[in-house]
Every structure is written in C-alpha cells, then in structure tokens.
Design a protein with these regions (language model features):
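C-terminal-of-GTPase-core extension/linker across diverse P-loop GTPases
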Residues: 4, 9-17, 23, 97-195
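Conserved G1/Walker A P-loop phosphate-binding module
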Residues: 1-72, 76-88, 92, 170-174, ...
Length: 195
C-alpha cells in the first residue's frame, strides 16, 4: 500500500529553483532551505490562504532531474505525489544560468513529466521565474518571460526573499485551483448521470 499526498497545486522544477523558499513565504510550512541541491528530500505541504475564507494546499515536490521518471534522484517517487494535483507551478531560477540553459532546464522537467505520465504532460501549468531580486537575474527576467509566454504559458516573475509577485501568483493559483475543483464536480456529476 502506498500513501500519496493530496494537494491542490504542486511546485515543480529542478533542484534549487526556489520551491521551498516560495512555500515558506506563502504558508506556515517551514521546509529546510539551503543553497545546495536536494535539500528537500520528501514532499512538503503548506496551506495557502489566498482570499477571505479561501485556501488551497500547495505541495513542494523535491527537485526533478533528467531521468526522474526512471527513478533517478528518487524522481519517480516524487512524481507520484504531483499526479494528485490539479495545477502545476513550474519554477525556473533566473539567476544561475543563461536564458538558453534555463529554457533547456524548463524543457527537461516537462519531458520528465511527460515520460512519467501523459496526464501530467497535459496538466495546466503556470511558469514562474524566481530569484528576480538577485543581480544576476536582472538580465534574464524579461527574455525568460517572453520565451515562456511564447510557449503558451502564463508567466509570473517573483522573489520569495522580498515577496515581490508572490501575492499575485497565489491569487492566480487560487483561481486555478477553484476552476479545477469546479471541473471535478462537473465530471463527477456527468459520471453519476451516466451510471
């Protein structure tokens, strides 16, 4: 028997993309945060209050690497937890690498999601450019936004350190989660009508 976490939205990305920092910023969860890969070794849940009497559960999924769907970096274990979410929040670090390398990182995570499950590949996804407060990110943010938008993604640029953009992102996630909940209710009603 296997226990899978139940969350409304899941944070995905490479190690050190800023997933734990974002979860700590927007919820009461206190994941370990450090500047080395695989600080997060197990999924962590946080409850995000995004409007009066409205909240959602956000899962910090440990970083995914190439080959995760085959178990590298324990990725297959982590991907099982993100299967239960209705919305993926895909974080990319604007401060560490060139725009081309960051876009390749974005593609790597999406390939791993698709290799694990076609359903995950089709899951609604919001792209988030992180660490925009760092001087090394300044030159990359606009081009990353443009290129991610060109792929059809809604894009947010945030700093978990300063909080810049986090409230707007959480509001958007909250609306996305509510939309997902409505779709599930409608699907359940349709399924009941067919029975």
């Amino acid at each position: 028997m296997e226990l899978r976490l139940l969350a409304d939205a899941g944070l995905v990305g490479l190690p050190n993309a800023g997933k734990s920092s974002l979860l700590a910023r927007v919820s009461a969860a206190r994941p370990k945060i450090a500047d080395y890969p695989f600080t997060t070794l197990a999924p962590i849940l946080g409850v995000v209050a995004w409007a009066d009497d409205k909240n959602f559960v956000l899962a910090d999924i440990p970083g995914l690497i190439e080959g995760a769907h085959e178990g590298l970096g324990l990725g297959d274990r982590f991907l099982r937890h993100v299967e239960r979410t209705s919305l993926l929040i895909h974080l990319v670090d604007a401060s560490e690498r060139s725009v081309d390398q960051t876009m390749e990182d974005f593609d790597t995570v999406n390939r791993e999601l698709a290799a694990y499950s076609e359903d995950l590949a089709d899951r609604p996804q919001i792209a988030v450019v992180t660490k925009i407060d760092l001087p090394t990110a300044a030159d990359n943010v606009d081009e990353l936004r443009e290129r991610l938008s060109a792929l059809g993604h809604e894009v947010f640029a945030i700093s978990s350190a300063t909080g810049h953009g986090c409230r707007e992102l959480m509001t958007r996630i909250g609306h996305g989660v509510e939309e997902g909940r409505r779709r599930r209710i409608e699907l359940n009603a349709e399924t009941s009508d067919l029975a």
